[in-house]
Amino acid sequence: MLKLLLGDPNARKLKRYQPIVSDINLLEEEIEPLSDDDLRRRTAEFRQRLEAAGSLDKQRPLLDDLLPEAFAVVREAGKRVLGMRHFDVQMIGGMVLHEGQIAEMKTGEGKTLVATLPSYLNALTGRGVHVVTVNDYLARRDAEWMGQVHRFLGLSVGLIQQDMTPAERRINYGCDITYATNSELGFDYLRDNMAADINEVVQREFQFCVIDEVDSILIDEARTPLIISGQVERPQEKYEKAAEVANALERAAEMGKDGIDPEGDYEVDEKQRSSTLTDEGFTKAEALIGVADLYNPQDPWAHYITNALKAKELFVRDVNYIVRDGEAVIVDEFTGRVMPGRRWSDGQHQAIEAKEGLAIQPETQTLASITYQNFFLLYPRLAGMTGTAKTEEVEFEKTYSLQTAIVPTNRVRARQDWVDQVYKTETAKWRAVAKETAEVHKQGRPVLVGTTSVEKSELLSALLAEENIPHNLLNAKPENVEREAEIVAQAGRAGSVTIATNMAGRGTDIILGGNSDYMARLKLREVLLPRLVRPEDDHRPPVPLQRSEEGGGGFSATAPASGPHGNAPSEAKAIGNLYPCQLTEETDQALVELAKQLVKAWGDRALSVIELEDRIATAAEKAPTEDPEIAQLRASIAQVKGEYDAVVKQEEMGVREAGGLHVIGTERHESRRVDNQLRGRAGRQGDPGSTRFFLSLGDNLLRIFGGERVAGLMNAFRVEEDMPIESGMLTRSLEGAQKKVETYYYDIRKQVFEYDEVMNNQRKAVYTERRRVLDGRELKKQVIGYGERTMNEIVEAYVNPDLPPEEWDVSQLVSKVKEFVYLLEDLQPDQLQGLSMDDLKAFLQEQLRNAYDLKEGEIEELRPGLMREAERFFILQQIDTLWREHLQAMDALRESVGLRGYGQKDPLIEYKNEGYDMFLEMMTNMRRNVIYSMFMFRPAPPAAAQATTA
């Protein structure tokens, strides 16, 4: 009703963009006839106009004025290089992003292409633009694919990947537009603020950032801080003993009247993800370990037991982690991907290693940390894209000051969302999923089944294998995860069945009939890899190919040939019938000749896998090239794609007529948004498609957040195990449960943000001080400033202004000054007699400056420049050591203030107040320690040093 009275605010916002879209369309006629060189020259012209404006504040209004012309130039470059023309709605999406908002654009509407518009415009300032994706694969794909547009227009494009060296990172961050993952950006920021030398710093000042899948990064991952850790030795046997004790303890089956079952040793709260020992549990655990008190500070055990119980009950193998090569590797709960190198903190990872009988790695201590919330707020301008932002609109606005605009689709949606089906048991649900998958598969339609864990995906895989239904598996298991792109490339083929763990945020569209462009590139890779790639580098994951005898459309799966570690041989071919047809003899022969020519040009097995893939990616571009080998490679890709296209187009028509992609959800996620992301895989760009969710009373959402009501209804109506319930009331009940969970997690994220905001202000102050030191500007002035403040603090500690001067303890004051500055050993108390408090401070500051000049003379005689090096070393050493200790102290404070809520005190206010006092004390200690270290610094003379060495 309110919308009817006041009008739709989103519609009003979009209406404002329409005249600008008209301007861009008019410019298209003017720009279309330009030569490639003339089009590129526009970039130089734009830059000259911006440079003439001067400061960034003056450039911003000019950027808005340049927008229509710049967007028209990018549209034309997209047509020439990618063969893709930005639709009008994509222009609107680009404007939303340029204004620093979130653009909600449905799956398949070309979000990746939209990002080229504001990226190009804001990169013209020369201050750098970051385009952020959720994983290395997508960052690489977008840098190669969309980077073509920017490179064509004369901008430099950088890419940050996990295995890059600092030197490579610095070069790539120095580019006009840099593609990177959220975690790499965050960790590089933290590492830069731990650097010992300015040359180790890789990032430059932040300016503009566009985040793809913004809800995944700013909402889903906001609860987890980025942490850089150092190792701390803890007794391994404690983890092993705790795991043994946890296995001997029994879980409370039901909650008693007081919240605890008297017959259980511990209770588990799945909602809070915590475990608590009962009184009986404490007694039993102490007896099993042979100690009198689990909380004895000299021999603490409680923390180890709590972590062991959580590892036993809340961290499930093949759901939360997988075991690979003797290590427990975390599985991302939102994307289903493994996260090698990441570890749970606070001893939790060690508890899981003990549970699984793995080698226990040393525990870690936090050296630096930041939440994604505070990291991305460092950007002066922040924007994001996603298919599902509206459900989190309030949080985006409150936490990040980001407004959300819903960009209309280019074509009307034709997808059908069928009603949820709820079963009493999980067994019945999985049978129903397998049955519907088989039925839709027989119709010749592709099916995508979304599961929530590796374990569930393998359960369904086994059920489908029993029915002889060919399928592909995409989950966190190493043999599957590396083949993600090619599995998705064929997920739209007629009759294909793909089981995927958490498709949310995977960033790859499923194209009906299959992706002929990717198939052609993979075919070239398969042919060239054995001839061009060094054998030792040829360790890419399995991609075995079995060619369909029919050589036509349709999907046939075959078991992959296994290599020595369960992986397929690395000549790398594609699982199942990836290629839609056999190539003609003429094309096959042309590929053989191409391989020979490239061996001559690039050497026999002389490239790395990445180098080969880079060259294939470059050849797949449409941008002009003067490299004869790349041109040859490009012609071969076009020849192969042409043959595949003929079959793929025909297959696409058949899939459309059959009803398009059918998406099956096997569990409601805690967030409605993630469910919508899965649904959004079907019906892209007006394609036909359908979706349905299959649920059971055993699903986590219903079990933890309110399944009793539904179970009561089913029992009341005596519903059979294999009979589903479909009802509006049930759907509303489920959505109500999801809203409860969303609110619960929003409160957690809000609390994380509020507490980290305290740390954030302190972090900014410390990192600003550190950067001053790294930049090396006025180091002496900085240290003397520390000394002057230290003198003031000594005076304030030993002089009481309320007492007459003759009662001041000047002797103690002088002794304390000499402790810090031994060069003032001749200072006598009578020199301070008769001075006021302010005069005392001024006198001691003057004495300190004189002493520091003397010290500098001593040190510089040994080697010019040594004093500045010492200043830099001691300041950085003290900042890093004390900041590390401060982080530990703040963690301990945060845990302890939680209990103060029982004393009618606000824990957050207590945390802020005490944290501030602790921070001031840390900074004071840092200044004092630097002054003490500088005056005590006595390097050996060069001659003495040489004699010692000899």
Swiss-Prot record:
GO CC annotation: cell envelope Sec protein transport complex; cytosol; plasma membrane-derived thylakoid membrane
Main location: membrane
Family annotation (InterPro entries): Helicase_ATP-bd (IPR014001), P-loop_NTPase (IPR027417), SecA (IPR000185), SecA_CS (IPR020937), SecA_DEAD (IPR011115), SecA_motor_DEAD (IPR014018), SecA_preprotein_X-link_dom (IPR011130), SecA_SF2_C (IPR044722)
Classification via Gene3D superfamilies: Helical scaffold and wing domains of SecA, P-loop containing nucleotide triphosphate hydrolases, SecA, preprotein cross-linking domain
Keyword Iron assigned: no
Location(s), subcellular: Cell inner membrane; Cellular thylakoid membrane; Cytoplasm
Pfam families documented for this protein: P-loop_SecA, SecA_DEAD, SecA_PP_bind, SecA_SW
Membrane topology, from the record: Peripheral membrane protein
CDD domains listed in its UniProt record: DEXDc_SecA, SF2_C_secA
Entry keywords, A to Z: ATP-binding, Cell inner membrane, Cell membrane, Cytoplasm, Membrane, Nucleotide-binding, Protein transport, Thylakoid, Translocase, Translocation, Transport
Complex formation: Monomer and homodimer. Part of the essential Sec protein translocation apparatus which comprises SecA, SecYEG and auxiliary proteins SecDF. Other proteins may also be involved.
Name of the featured protein: Protein translocase subunit SecA
Encoding gene (name): secA
